[in-house]
């Protein structure tokens, strides 16, 4: 079992601050990070994955420090985000051949298998891909170097409902391989069936919830949405 520990990690921009954040994740479990746009979800994931520098604190993966050993740390993290840029004028296969060997556990065979399972055509140049296809490619690449943790920023947005179910089935298989998954997403009934833990971002503050709180949170979200609909109807129609 692997552990990803976030210890007082913080980040400040001109008009936003991610408050010092601490939590611990274990491999084999899916944690969902929810919250409104601009609440700090992407900021936390970018810092935790090593893509963006952070102001204070540290993250450790099985004792490997992001602050002190960033290359070794990032070698064990798979990161997926539509903000990531690969060689956009090249195909997924070319990107795999060029970038994959920089990871110590890269497997081109696993890359092929994952792309086939996700119904992804690897020959097109990346700039030609839709958002959903680009997220498929990134997920395959991230998993092909056999990370201990997979960090994903809103991976479901570009998927149609049919593929979304298939994608979550693949994620369940990844969890069964003892990989930890940390996903930012708007909570849905589909994610409810797979999520083990829930984190919530609100104006730069991150709160952690136990599994038994997930049902109550989702119920409250549904009630809130229904009340918003009723209010909108009463004001406009």
Region annotations inferred by a language model:
Residues 150-154, 159:
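Catalytic Walker B motif of ABC-type/P-loop ATPase nucleotide-binding domains
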Residues 49:
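Helix-to-loop junction immediately C-terminal to a conserved catalytic motif
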Residues 57-68, 72-73:
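Conserved ABC transporter NBD signature motif
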Residues 184-186:
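H-loop/switch region of ABC-family ATPase nucleotide-binding domains
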Residues 6-9, 16-29, 57:
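Conserved beta-strand
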Residues 34-36:
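The feature captures the beta-strand-to-loop junction immediately N-terminal to the Walker
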Residues 81-137:
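ABC-family P-loop ATPase nucleotide-binding domains
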